[in-house]
């Protein structure tokens, strides 16, 4: 597995604190010496990477190399077998499944997610999120009737309701 980043990606490591002074490095993520175990099998040993706010990083590698396990671990859904993960911004995660309720409309899914996470609770903000992902034309249909691509767009719209400084982890 490899992480593709700009050459300057390691110049500004992340800090644990959510409160930073004006001279602090940009917000970000630091993974240091992390070992990943999945199904009792070591899939990564001593993995390290750093990212700063605004970067886009692609994880690539063969099936079973630990890409999804790493994302789930950074998101706090799986424990690391060793090492440390520091992130000074909120983490928002979409896994293989989009986490949408199939019986609800896309709009209802966004409203419920916002309410459960203590975020915006107004139609204008939800419409703006749907517009950002070009999902408003099908937002009032039950999710079970949407194509896979339409579901992903609704799931991505959900993330845009979160904090603008959040780290997005998108798995496939």
Question: Regions from the language model: what does each represent?
Answer:
Residues 29, 44-46:
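Conserved structural motif at the start of ABC-family nucleotide-binding domains
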Residues 58, 151-160:
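ABC ATPase nucleotide-binding domain "signature" region
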Residues 60-62:
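The feature captures the beta-strand-to-loop junction immediately N-terminal to the Walker
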Residues 75:
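Helix-to-loop junction immediately C-terminal to a conserved catalytic motif
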Residues 97, 102-118, 125:
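Q-loop/switch helix immediately C-terminal to the Walker
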Residues 123-138:
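Conserved ABC ATPase "signature" region
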Residues 135, 147-153:
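ABC ATPase nucleotide-binding domain "signature motif"
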Residues 142-146:
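Conserved ABC ATPase signature
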């Amino acid at each position: 597995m490899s992480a593709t980043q700009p050459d300057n990606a390691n110049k500004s490591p992340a800090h644990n604190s959510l409160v930073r002074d004006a001279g602090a490095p940009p917000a970000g993520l630091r993974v240091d010496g992390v070992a990943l175990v999945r199904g009792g099998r070591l899939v990564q040993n001593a993995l390290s990477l750093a990212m700063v706010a605004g970067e886009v990083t692609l994880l690539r590698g063969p099936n079973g190399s630990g890409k999804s396990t790493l994302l789930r671990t950074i998101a706090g859904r799986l424990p690391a077998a060793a090492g440390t993960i520091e992130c000074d911004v909120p983490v928002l995660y979409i896994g293989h499944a989009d986490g949408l309720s199939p019986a609800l409309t896309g709009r209802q899914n966004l409203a419920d997610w916002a309410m459960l996470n203590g975020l915006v609770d107004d139609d204008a903000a939800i419409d703006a999120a749907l517009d950002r992902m070009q999902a408003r034309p099908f937002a009032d249909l039950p999710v079970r009737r949407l194509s896979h691509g339409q579901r992903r767009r609704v799931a991505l719209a959900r993330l845009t309701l979160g904090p603008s400084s959040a780290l997005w982890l998108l798995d496939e």
